[in-house]
């Protein structure tokens, strides 16, 4: 099963950090920026008509995977974006009531 994971899509985009020391941009902000990159890539791919899914998991940051993609030990693979095309129409998701999660203040 593990060996077939890369075959699930014709293209996989790897999102990884490349931490840079900067007194005004701490590592956690750089990590969050990588997450924003992934989300914006998903939006861009969908706008171009592609199907994509952002995956992570226990194998994502193993030394072997990091080495394969040239990600150094101190950096993080934030996700793999599996990308391709499909004629399948995805069903609409049910709208989630955000009132349990969001608090509005004035």
For each predicted feature, which ranges?
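Glycine/small-residue-rich phosphate/adenosyl-binding loop
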Residues: 1-34
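Acidic, glycine-rich active-site loops and adjacent beta-strand->loop/helix elements
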Residues: 19-20, 58-62, 87
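GST superfamily/GST-like fold recognition
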Residues: 29, 50-64
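Aromatic/hydrophobic pocket-lining residues that form π-stacking "cages" and hydrophobic walls in ligand
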Residues: 40-41
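Short hydrophobic alpha-helices that are characteristic scaffold elements of the AMP-binding
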Residues: 46-47
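Short, electropositive alpha-helical surface patch
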Residues: 65-78
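C-terminal helix-cap and adjacent tail motif
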Residues: 76-106
């Amino acid at each position: 099963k593990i060996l077939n994971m890369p075959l699930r899509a014709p293209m996989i985009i790897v999102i990884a950090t490349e931490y840079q020391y900067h007194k005004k941009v701490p590592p956690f902000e750089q990590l969050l920026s990588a997450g924003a990159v992934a989300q914006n890539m998903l939006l861009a791919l969908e706008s171009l008509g592609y199907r994509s899914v952002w995956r992570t998991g226990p194998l994502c940051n193993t030394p072997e995977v990091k080495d394969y993609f040239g990600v150094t030990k101190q950096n993080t693979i934030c996700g793999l974006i599996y990308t391709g095309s499909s004629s399948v129409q995805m069903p609409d998701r049910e709208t989630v009531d955000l009132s349990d999660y969001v608090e509005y203040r004035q």
